[in-house]
C-alpha cells in the first residue's frame, strides 16, 4: 500500500524564518529565501544562460518545501527574454504543506523581496495546489509553458520511479545532519540515472559525506562561495568516469517536422490532439464517422470519479492520478474559454451492502484520503443529500460528477485551433512507415490519406488491427444505456453510482445504465437491456419501481467499450513486434525498456468504462514521451499501461516467432 502523506506543520521563528518542528531545521536562510534560491540554485546551475540553448529545460529539486526555489526560477524565466520555450520543474516532497499553509509561508517570504513580479505567482501556485495524495501531480502555468511536476512521497522511493532527463539539479532539503536519508548515496545514484550528459547541480552544503556520495554517483564537484557569508557551497556537473546506468533517460522523438496523425476522434483521440497542439505539433485527426465523438464518446453523459481500494493497487493509483490530472486539464480548458457541459456538485457512490460500506469507510481512514477527494457518507447523510431513499451509505466524491463527452471532445479540438486538420468519413485500413521515416495512413484501396512523423492510434478496438499488433488482447464490450422521461425516476441532484449509475440530464430526463455484454456486436437498443437497467436502478434507488415503466417504449443508446484482458488501458509507444520476433531468443528475459519500439507509433486505447478518467493523463503521457519531457506519472504506473506489456509476456513464454 502507498504510504499516506503527512503534511508539514507551518511554524515561523521570531525572525520570520520558516522552520520544521519535525526536522528541527529551517527551510531557508534567515538572509532571504529568494536571494538564496538565486545565488545557490539558479546561478549555481549557470542559469538563465544555459536554458537559452534548449527548446525545453528540465530541473529536478529534491525538496519543494515552501516553493521558493520554484517561484524564484519561474520569475527568472519570465524575466529572461531569451528563455527556453518550455520550462519543467520537478520537485519531490515527503511532507508537503496544506494549501493555505503554503500560501501563508510563501506570501510571508516574498513580502520582503525586491523581486516585484514574484508576489502574484504565490497565489497562482497556491490556487493550483493539488490534493495531498501520494504520487505525481502536474501543474501548468503561463499557458503551459511552465510545468511544475510535484512528486509527493519519500525521495528514496519515488526518485527511482521517475522517467525524465534532467538538465539541472537543485539539491535542497534539510541539512544532512537533520535528514541524512535525503543526502544518501542511493539518492545520488537515482539522480545519476536521470541526468542529461550536460547536467549540472548546485547545493548549499559542502559536507564531506555529500561530496563522497556525489563522486560515487558520477558527479564532479567544486567548492564556490556560499550564500550570505557561508564559506562554501558545491556546484558541479554529471561527469561519470564509468558507466553508471543500464538505460538512458528518455529523449525527445527526433524529427525535422512536428506533425502527427491521430486516428479516432473520441475522448482518447481528442485529448491527444489538444496536448500535441499545445506543444506546437500540427495534427491531422482522422475519424471514420462523419463527426467527432460519434461512438462510445457520443453518449449523453459519462461519470467521472477515482477508484479507491484498501491496498491502493495499480488500478486505484492510476484512476486517482487520471482523475486529478483530468480536473486540472478541464479547468485549464475552461479558463481558456473552451467550455463544455459538466456537473460540478459532486458524485455519490453507494455501497451494495452494510459490509461494503464499512470497508469503504475503513479504506478512506486507512489511506488518509483527503476530504476534497473523497469522504464517507452515512445512509442518513446520503438520503438527505440525494433527497431520496437509499439502502446503504457510501462515498461522496466532491469533485466527481458527469460530463457530456462530445462537448469535451469539441472543446479539446477547439483549443487546438489552426494546428488541427480534420478528415472525417474515412476509415484507415493500415499504417506504413516509409524509407523517409514518415508514417502513412492508408485506406482499404491503398491510397495515402495522410502522412506524418508520428501516429497515435486512438480508435478503441480497431487500434490494434490498424497498427498490426498481434500481442494486444482487447475485447469489445457492448453497453446499453436507458433514457427515462421526466418524472419517472427519483430527481437526484447529482450523479449516483453503485450497481449501475443514474445521471440527471437537462429538462428532467434521467440517464441510467449500463449493460456489460462482451463480444455482442448488436448496435440496436433492446428491450431486455432496458429492463436490466431498470432493475439495476431499482436496487440503487429503492424509491424507483422497475415495473412502473414499459421497457419496450424507452429510448436509449448502445456504445462499445474497448477493454484489455487485464482491464488496464494501453497508452504509450507501441512495440515493434516484427523486430521482437527477429530477436526473440535474446529477449526471453526482457523488460519493457529492452523491447524494440515502433519508432513514432503510439497508442491510446483500451480505456473501457474509464475514458473520462484516463484520457487526459494518457494524452499527457504520450505528448511527454514524444517531446522527451518528464512523464506525468511514475514509471511503475506507466509500465502497467505500456502497450508492449503483452509483447513482453509473450516473449517470456516463447510465444513470439
Swiss-Prot record:
Sequence segments annotated as region (FAD-dependent cmnm(5)s(2)U34 oxidoreductase): 263-657
Coiled-coil segments on the chain, per record: none
Keywords from the named record: Cytoplasm, FAD, Flavoprotein, Methyltransferase, Multifunctional enzyme, Oxidoreductase, S-adenosyl-L-methionine, Transferase, tRNA processing
Cellular compartments annotated: Cytoplasm
InterPro entries: FAD-dep_OxRdtase, FAD/NAD-bd_sf, MnmC-like_methylTransf, SAM-dependent_MTases_sf, tRNA_MAMT_biosynth_bifunc_MnmC, tRNA_MNMC2, tRNA_S-uridine_synth_MnmC_C
Catalytic reactions of this protein: 5-aminomethyl-2-thiouridine(34) in tRNA + S-adenosyl-L-methionine = 5-methylaminomethyl-2-thiouridine(34) in tRNA + S-adenosyl-L-homocysteine + H(+)
A Pfam family that the UniProt record links to this protein: Methyltransf_30
GO CC field: cytoplasm
Cofactor: FAD
SUPFAM superfamilies for this protein: FAD-linked reductases, C-terminal domain, FAD/NAD(P)-binding domain
Its EC number(s): 2.1.1.61, 1.5.-.-
Molecular function GO labels: flavin adenine dinucleotide binding; oxidoreductase activity, acting on the CH-NH group of donors; tRNA (5-methylaminomethyl-2-thiouridylate)(34)-methyltransferase activity
Gene3D superfamilies according to UniProt: D-Amino Acid Oxidase, subunit A, domain 2, FAD/NAD(P)-binding domain, Vaccinia Virus protein VP39
Positions of region (tRNA (mnm(5)s(2)U34)-methyltransferase): 1-239
BP terms from Gene Ontology: methylation; tRNA wobble base modification
Family: In the N-terminal section; belongs to the methyltransferase superfamily. tRNA (mnm(5)s(2)U34)-methyltransferase family. In the C-terminal section; belongs to the DAO family.
Protein name per UniProt: tRNA 5-methylaminomethyl-2-thiouridine biosynthesis bifunctional protein MnmC
